[in-house]
């Protein structure tokens, strides 16, 4: 571990540091949920041919993505407060103007 890692996990670390680590661990724990929900969406279409199940699992998927996205934005804001160069935080992709949920439901309508 680096010196800053030692500081982060030492007894001297502030409650803010501890909270940031907990937030990151919580976000990391949600990543498998995204894959699980996406898999269930595919199964709902392929195996069950159930639009109701697809909607349920796609809602779970989108809620999990939103949770992670919000958490990552908060982490980025915390980094900005720590005077990290903003250039390193700029997204490299353009964001779609159409919400992801609309795209998913449009595609599911085409499949049904």
Swiss-Prot record:
BP GO annotations: positive regulation of transcription initiation by RNA polymerase II
The keyword Cytoplasm appears for this protein: yes
UniProt xrefs under Pfam families: Med11
Subcellular location: Cytoplasm; Nucleus
Xref: Gene3D superfamilies: 1.10.287.3490
The keyword Cytoplasm is annotated on this UniProt entry: yes
CC per GO annotation: cytoplasm; mediator complex; nucleus
Entry keywords, A to Z: Cytoplasm, Nucleus
UniProt cross-references to InterPro entries, sorted A to Z: Mediator_Med11
Domain of life: Eukaryota
GO MF: transcription coactivator activity
Subunit details: Component of the Mediator complex, which is composed of at least 21 subunits that form three structurally distinct submodules. The Mediator head module, the middle module, and the tail module. The head and the middle modules interact directly with RNA polymerase II, whereas the elongated tail module interacts with gene-specific regulatory proteins. Med11 is part of the head module. Forms a heterodimer with med22. The med11/22 heterodimer binds to and stabilizes the central head subunit med17.
Similarity remark: Belongs to the Mediator complex subunit 11 family.
Biological role stated in the UniProt entry: Component of the Mediator complex, a coactivator involved in the regulated transcription of nearly all RNA polymerase II-dependent genes. Mediator functions as a bridge to convey information from gene-specific regulatory proteins to the basal RNA polymerase II transcription machinery. Mediator is recruited to promoters by direct interactions with regulatory proteins and serves as a scaffold for the assembly of a functional pre-initiation complex (PIC) with RNA polymerase II and the general transcription factors.
Name of the molecule in the record: Mediator of RNA polymerase II transcription subunit 11
Protein species of origin: Schizosaccharomyces pombe (strain 972 / ATCC 24843)
């Amino acid at each position: 571990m680096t010196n800053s890692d030692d500081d982060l996990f030492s007894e001297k670390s502030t409650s803010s540091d501890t909270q940031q680590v907990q937030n990151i661990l919580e976000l990391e724990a949600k990543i498998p949920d995204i894959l699980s929900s996406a898999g269930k969406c595919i199964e709902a279409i392929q195996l069950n041919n159930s639009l109701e199940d697809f909607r349920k699992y796609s809602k779970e998927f989108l809620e999990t993505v939103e949770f992670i996205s919000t958490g990552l934005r908060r982490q980025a804001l915390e980094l900005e407060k720590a005077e990290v160069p903003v250039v390193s935080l700029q997204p490299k992709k353009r964001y779609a103007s159409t919400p992801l949920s609309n795209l998913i439901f449009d595609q599911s309508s085409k499949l049904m």
